[in-house]
């Protein structure tokens, strides 16, 4: 749980956590801020202090919902820094980060980097920043010894959210079964009202519609695979494949809360009509 973060940081010799990227579909950020409409942000978690969230000026109200100490990027003149560095955006961005870090008195110690960013540009900025601030050790939590450990234990709110996703997911699975069993059989295939085959693509389209209607997202797609595809690990299924009787169907669905919060993973293996050896 979040209450463990300070102790885990101390155990692992970390002076700060730096989480960068958007406020959605960015698990480390969402864990602290909740699902927030932040297109780009930086969060600094320092033991004994309220977390510090840097945000774009247009997203100040969204950032305020976090309850954290706020810093607007607009407080720093990036254009002036770009001119100062003769157009070197990477170095200018590093200089802005240096100003931010000095302002929050984070100028030395071990800083663990988390988050979801385009790795190339961010890596270049971090290289510049490391040279500008040599007393900082910018590194990664390769063993995931802090956030993974903290997230292994859930509080009641987290459990309620996971249960809600479980109920939603199993509702969609029930709907899927009803969809399949409501279709007529022609030969060994399920057919639609116009006589055309019901396909994997038809079923997955309907799954996505249900998930959207019930308030979830499906960013990782769904595995709904039949026949040979069902025997290939993590084959998501061929959209044009018809749904046939007696063929193995692997159904693995793992949607998440809107904005990329908690997921729920549910798997079933089906065979319609009868099961072959």
Annotate each PLM feature:
Residues 1-277:
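Active-site neighborhoods and metal-handling regions in enzymes and metal-associated proteins
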């Amino acid at each position: 749980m979040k209450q463990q973060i300070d102790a885990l940081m101390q155990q692992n010799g970390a002076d700060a956590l730096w989480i960068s990227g958007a406020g959605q579909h960015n698990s480390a950020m969402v864990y602290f801020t909740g699902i927030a409409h932040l297109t780009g942000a930086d969060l600094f978690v320092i033991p004994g202090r309220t977390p510090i969230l840097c945000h774009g000026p247009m997203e100040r109200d969204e950032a305020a919902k976090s309850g954290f100490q706020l810093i607007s990027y607009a407080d720093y003149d990036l254009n002036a820094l770009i001119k100062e560095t003769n157009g070197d955006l990477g170095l200018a961005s590093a200089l802005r980060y240096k100003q931010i870090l000095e302002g929050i008195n984070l100028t030395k110690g071990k800083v663990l980097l988390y988050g979801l960013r385009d790795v190339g540009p961010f890596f270049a900025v971090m290289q510049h920043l490391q040279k500008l601030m040599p007393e900082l050790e910018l590194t990664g939590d390769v063993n995931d010894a802090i956030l993974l450990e903290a997230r292994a234990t859930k509080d009641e709110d987290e459990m309620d959210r996971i249960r809600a996703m479980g109920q939603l997911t199993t509702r969609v699975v029930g709907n899927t079964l009803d969809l399949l069993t409501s279709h007529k059989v022609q030969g060994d295939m399920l057919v639609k009202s116009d006589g055309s085959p019901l396909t994997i693509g038809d079923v997955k389209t309907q799954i996505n519609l249900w998930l959207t209607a019930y308030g979830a997202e499906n960013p990782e797609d769904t595995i709904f695979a039949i026949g040979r595809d069902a025997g290939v690990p993590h084959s998501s299924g061929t959209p044009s494949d018809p749904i046939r009787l007696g063929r193995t169907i692997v159904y693995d669905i793992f949607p998440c809360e809107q904005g990329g919060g908690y997921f729920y993973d549910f798997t079933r293996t089906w065979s319609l009509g009868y099961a072959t050896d």
